[in-house]
Regions:
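Active-site environment of divalent metal-dependent phosphoester hydrolases
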Residues: 17-21, 50-55, 78-86, 115-118, ...
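Extended active-site neighborhood of metal-dependent phosphoesterases/phosphodiesterases
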Residues: 54-132, 171-173, 219
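Beta-strand-turn-beta hairpins that frame and shape the catalytic cleft
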Residues: 1-10, 99-109, 135-142, 193-198
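N-terminal active-site segment of His-dependent metallophosphoesterases
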Residues: 1-65
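A short C-terminal boundary segment appended to hydrolase-like catalytic domains
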Residues: 3, 223-260
């Protein structure tokens, strides 16, 4: 637990346990770095496995159990739902949708995966639940899913946003969501749309990378008046991405065009 007024969230994605590209030393180092930060919450936005097999899930669970935090939020990705893998997810990680009202945050996490398909959607049947979870709270609102909510440069021609992205964006903006966290295509990026930031992280522990990408994860620091987001590279330090005001929504971007 932080000793100051800052709440910290570690955001990891795309572990891909079982992949020939998986590097255990990267994940071990990331977990060491995260534990040094002592975050209140750890968020894992899917693709813990490569093919959804039970043995891959058990490996992922062993690593995740090493993360020291008060609250853990995990959703499945498209790889996790292969081979009926969502059954193993529920057995080892619990419900595929979670909500946390704590630490001055409201975090709603939803499963965007479809069995044996790479594309995803949330589905309008989930909209009333999502809107209800955000209603009546004065906290900082965050939404978590695996797939992209907006297109990401450098991710190819695959349709990798959720099919119902437009409706979901409108719902989240109406619900005063300030930050969306996702993974999926191993390309870290950030969009600013109206009063909301949509931030993806890359893969934390595989070398299945695009171009000059590097394994990475994000750390979010939430202060009383501001939010800061950093991109961290296991073994290789960190760089700031965004800082924004919780009240005025003014923001400062960092890096080479990382935020648009």
């Amino acid at each position: 637990m932080s000793t100051d007024s800052v709440t910290r969230i570690a955001h990891l994605s795309d572990l891909h346990c079982g992949s020939p590209h998986f590097k255990a030393d990267l994940l071990e180092r990331a977990i060491e770095e995260i534990n040094e930060l002592r975050p209140e919450v750890a968020v894992i936005s899917g693709d813990l496995t490569t093919d959804g097999f039970e043995r891959e899930y058990r490996t992922a669970r062993e690593f995740v159990d090493r993360i020291e935090c008060a609250d853990l939020i995990v959703v499945p990705g498209n790889h996790d739902s292969r081979n009926v893998g969502y059954i193993h997810f529920e057995e080892l990680f619990g419900p595929r949708a979670q909500t946390l009202h704590k630490h001055g945050l409201t975090i709603v996490a939803e499963d965007s995966s479809e069995p044996d398909l790479d594309h995803g959607q949330i589905g309008r049947n989930r909209y009333p639940h999502i809107e209800g979870e955000f209603a009546g709270f004065a906290n900082l609102n965050l939404f978590v899913l695996h797939h992209h909510l907006l297109p990401i440069p450098g991710t190819g021609r695959e349709r990798n946003i959720v099919y119902d992205a437009g409706d979901l964006l409108e719902l989240l903006l109406r619900s005063r969501v300030k930050l969306v966290l996702a993974g999926h295509k191993h390309v870290p990026y950030a969009w600013h749309i109206e009063s909301m930031f949509v931030v993806t992280t890359g893969t934390v522990s595989t070398l299945r990378l695009r171009g000059h990408g590097r394994p990475c994860y994000n750390v979010i620091e939430v202060g009383p008046e501001w939010v800061r987001i950093y991109r961290k590279y296991p073994f290789e330090g960190q760089e700031p991405i965004i800082e924004f005001s919780r009240e005025t929504h003014e923001y400062e971007k960092h890096g080479l065009g990382a935020v648009t």
